[in-house]
């Protein structure tokens, strides 16, 4: 079995952009409406992704499938980019 890393090591790594969990259904619906998409249109992030595991440990609760993860990337060339991914179970 793989050794678990300290969530702060994962979440504060220089190559890992800021991730924020959104699990409030009203907020999710508002975001989807603003983007003009359905949940199924968003890219996915699995519940076993190292960042999702670290966020779960940091928040003290399991991040459930159907939640959104807001990812904010800062780039010297592209500026600030915000993307959303929907949490899903990994394929079996």
Curated annotation (Swiss-Prot):
Q: Where in the cell is it found?
A: Cytoplasm
The reply on keyword Transcription is yes
What's one GO BP annotation on this UniProt entry?
A: DNA-templated transcription
Q: What class of enzyme is it?
A: transferase
Keywords noted in UniProt: Cytoplasm, DNA-directed RNA polymerase, Nucleotidyltransferase, Transcription, Transferase
Listed EC numbers: 2.7.7.6
Gene3D superfamilies, per database record: RPB5-like RNA polymerase subunit
Gene Ontology annotations for the cellular component aspect, listed alphabetically: cytoplasm; DNA-directed RNA polymerase complex
State the Gene Ontology terms under molecular function. Answer: DNA binding; DNA-directed RNA polymerase activity
Catalytic activity, as annotated? RNA(n) + a ribonucleoside 5'-triphosphate = RNA(n+1) + diphosphate
Where is this protein chiefly located? cytoplasm
Question: Which InterPro entries does the entry mention?
Answer: Arch_Rpo5/euc_Rpb5, RNA_pol_subH/Rpb5_C, RNA_pol_subH/Rpb5_CS, RPB5-like_sf
Q: In which family does this protein belong, per the annotation? A: Belongs to the archaeal Rpo5/eukaryotic RPB5 RNA polymerase subunit family.
Protein name as catalogued: DNA-directed RNA polymerase subunit Rpo5
Q: Which organism is it from?
A: Methanopyrus kandleri (strain AV19 / DSM 6324 / JCM 9639 / NBRC 100938)
Query: Taxonomic lineage of this organism?
Result: Archaea, Methanobacteriati, Methanobacteriota, Methanomada group, Methanopyri
